[in-house]
């Protein structure tokens, strides 16, 4: 019975570690750089703005701009 409890505990720790780790750094599906843009901290004209993820609250802009 004790062995079963130890195995269950180990399994629980493994599952918890996996959940805490979560997915790898922001999913690159919606990443700005991977989709032909670059993250800018300055103003980006509305026509050049892309709706992709940028860290630190930056705006995703088309690479052709600036």
Swiss-Prot record:
Residues with the Tyrosine amide modification: 65
UniProt subunit comment: Forms dimers and higher-order oligomers.
Prosegment location in residue numbers: 23-26
Superkingdom classification of source: Eukaryota
Signal peptide (from-to): 1-22
Known role: Antimicrobial peptide. Has antibacterial activity against Gram-positive bacteria S.aureus ATCC 29737 and B.subtilis ATCC 6633 as well as against Gram-negative bacteria E.coli ATCC 10536 and K.pneumoniae ATCC 10031.
Protein name: Panusin
UniProt KW Cytoplasm keyword: no
């Amino acid at each position: 019975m004790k062995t079963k409890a130890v195995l269950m505990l180990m399994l629980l720790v493994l599952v918890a570690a996996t959940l805490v780790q979560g997915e790898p750094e922001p999913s690159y599906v919606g990443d700005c750089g991977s989709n032909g843009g670059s993250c800018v901290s300055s103003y980006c004209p509305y026509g050049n703005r892309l709706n992709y993820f940028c860290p630190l609250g930056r705006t995703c802009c088309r690479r052709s701009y600036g």
